[in-house]
């Protein structure tokens, strides 16, 4: 609202049709199954209100959070008597949210995300995926730059940050040195160790960057012929290379779906193979192309969105955003609330 950046609804996140693969069979979710579908999430997250009563203030229930810290999503799923539909819906959705296998994903981190949206499935879906910037994230960046009068240097990597009594000296790969009284560090957690800090960062920050968060996988955009409608697909990674997808942009001649995959090399997968995969969910669909960016191999990210590993919250959550002399740490990867989201980066 501050900048008047236009937003629009993502069609598939208000889906008219949900195709869900349970085992080796694809079914269209029926109206009489919606209660069962949503109830699976309420069962999985039944403890979240007590554990994350105030999701923007983890100190409020820190003991309860730390008590669950070592648990994985797989641990929680195995403890519940969910129906096959619920197990696929919850498991698949959380594979997308964590961008990793349930055995590697943190139960605490998933509860945090659920609590941020008021323990409500509809708000969870709307907040996490339903709305997007009409002109992309770049429109927001441009508005912030114009408002603040900043100078932006693209394709300019930082190799070192040296602190002195008077401030900081930031050196880029091309040898340019920028001197300032303070530095706000928004480098993603997974590449923080690629910058040489003098004096060195705390041992905990170095440990966290070396360990890395669990966010991996691939976001694969799929261009299809015609208009498939406002559709969503859902599966488990053990049952399909496509754990989920939704209509991202509709058009009469061609449309685009946003898909998610944990399969290695998903972006290099031949179009013919993706055709077979998607047609299982949407019979008759014809793929035109696939595209996306490999954030895992990108030297400036080395991963997708951030969620901490099981058992690391208690060690990392207070230390990662703690300032060190003239360096202040304020990335989405260290945000107290919307960690891993653009809201966390802004906050």
What are these regions (language model features)?
Residues 204-230:
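Central beta-strand plus flanking loop segment that forms part of the substrate or channel wall
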Residues 1-53:
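N-terminal glycine-rich phosphate/pyrophosphate-binding loop and immediately adjacent elements
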Residues 2-19, 84-91, 229-235:
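A short alpha-helix-loop-beta-strand transition element characteristic
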Residues 183-203:
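Flavin (primarily FAD) binding-site architecture
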Residues 31, 167, 233-347:
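Conserved flavin/dinucleotide-binding core of flavoenzymes
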Residues 56-157, 165-167, 186-188, 196:
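Active-site/ligand-binding neighborhood in enzyme catalytic cores
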